[in-house]
């Protein structure tokens, strides 16, 4: 299980990303429309003004149950060992164990 502080930090980053999402998107559109280089530099300065943790690349996908940051399956939102345990216990609909 991940530490509670790391999970809270990730939630804080998600809130910041949602808050500044429109500002980042509009600044990127402005950069593509403006022809002069000096204006692009000014808009680029605006793009750097939001907090660093509001960037979408700072977000990390975590396991829904344990908070584990690695080996996550997007379809289920679970880490590998939790997914395996749930499938073996028949708690995930549509997931079957492989047999050949």
Swiss-Prot record:
Q: Any idea where this protein resides?
A: Plastid, Chloroplast
Pfam families (alphabetical): Ribosomal_S14 (PF00253)
Would you say which domain of life the source belongs to?
A: Eukaryota
Q: What is its main location?
A: plastid
Instruction: List the keywords (alphabetical).
Output: Chloroplast, Plastid, Ribonucleoprotein, Ribosomal protein, RNA-binding, rRNA-binding
Xref: PROSITE patterns: RIBOSOMAL_S14
User: Tell me, how does this one assemble?
Assistant: Part of the 30S ribosomal subunit.
The protein here is known as: Small ribosomal subunit protein uS14c
- Lineage, top ranks: Eukaryota, Viridiplantae, Streptophyta, Embryophyta, Tracheophyta
- In the UniProt record, the gene name given for this protein reads rps14
């Amino acid at each position: 299980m991940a530490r509670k502080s790391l999970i809270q930090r990730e939630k804080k980053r998600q809130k910041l990303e949602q808050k500044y999402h429109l500002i980042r998107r509009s600044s990127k559109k402005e950069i593509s429309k403006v022809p002069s280089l000096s204006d692009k530099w000014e808009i680029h300065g605006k793009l750097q003004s939001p907090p660093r943790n509001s960037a979408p690349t700072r977000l990390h996908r975590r396991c829904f149950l344990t908070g584990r940051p690695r080996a996550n399956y997007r379809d289920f939102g679970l880490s590998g060992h939790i997914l395996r345990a749930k499938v073996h216990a028949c708690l995930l609909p549509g997931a079957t164990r492989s047999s050949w």
